[in-house]
Amino acid sequence: MPSQPSSILAAVPTSFLPSLPVRRLTRTTWRPCRKRRFASTTSRLLHDVPTLPFRFETGIGLFAKRPPRPFPPPFLSPPSTSFTDPLSTHHQSRDRRAFVNGQLIRGKTNGDDAVYASDYFICANDGVGAWATRPRGHAGLWSRLVGHFWSCAIEEELAGLAKLQEPNPIASLQSAYEQTLEATTSHDCLGTTTTCGAQLHYKIGAEDKAQTSPVLYVTNVGDCQVMVLRPSTEKVIYKTVEQWHWFDCPRQLGTNSPDTPTGDAVTDKIDLEVGDIVLAMSDGVIDNLWEHEIVARILKSVKDWESGTHAEAHKGDRTGGRNGGMRIVAQDLMEAAREIAVDPFAESPFMEHAIEEGLASEGGKLDDISVVAALCVENDA
């Protein structure tokens, strides 16, 4: 999400925050970070989480418009700059991973975005970039912590669920929101984030109790998006609806925001089929690509993977993008969005929406671009 003074910060009394600059729809001049590719993206689940009949095969694609602001202590302790400290302080073996409450923070940071992927849950969070202008603003920390605590809450709930009991993703997100508030407020770390997540579950057949089918619980706050594509019909069977306060100011969770999961999050339940592809995307994707462009790119990536166009050597069935194809799907979609984002003359959905609001805008929208692609498969584990 771009640095936008039109975020919820603009609604905060000036007695709490410094004066905000006037919003201008001018092209940002951030130097793009190197695109990052990850071979393994599925996080390890807790040992006591039950095995479900279905699972996700996942892949991610990330592009950051600028380097993320480093997490502050105690979440990340940077090495001292004093030459009087022991040399071990600066040694490469020193642990620079991010922690909260003694645990490694799950997921990956991408500029102000954060993503998470596991066998049963994926999410994409978009931190509000305007916090980068505040000395204690850490939107990237907020987006990462919400994903971390949300995934933990979902796994804890899943471990305690009775058979056939439905999950409650809004309650899990509310718990994550409250834990993030507690963790950041005590250290004066400010920020807000939008979020979307998709939790995979299942249901029993009405007539044949031995028959199970996959079900997806999708939860959204703001303008990230979950989209479900059925390659067998080449159709989008579901996508979330963006939530706005006003143009370019989505609903968001965090410092000084009136939005909360219990009050503003929307959850939908979708019947899935094995082979369906679930996407969790930041607005860096949907602001630069129309729906039909996303669908076309996904279908092409899957077809290329099935035909062996990609050079990666993967054993096993490649049908529908299995055994590594989701990594290619996510990276290809990220690359398609990036090409538009950096093109000052491209036509984009964001440009179209801005013009509808009477605002001057041209080209793509340079933003952090985060994609999590997940393929629904039977769980043979």
Identify the role of each PLM range.
Residues 2-381:
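PP2C/PPM-type serine/threonine phosphatase catalytic domain
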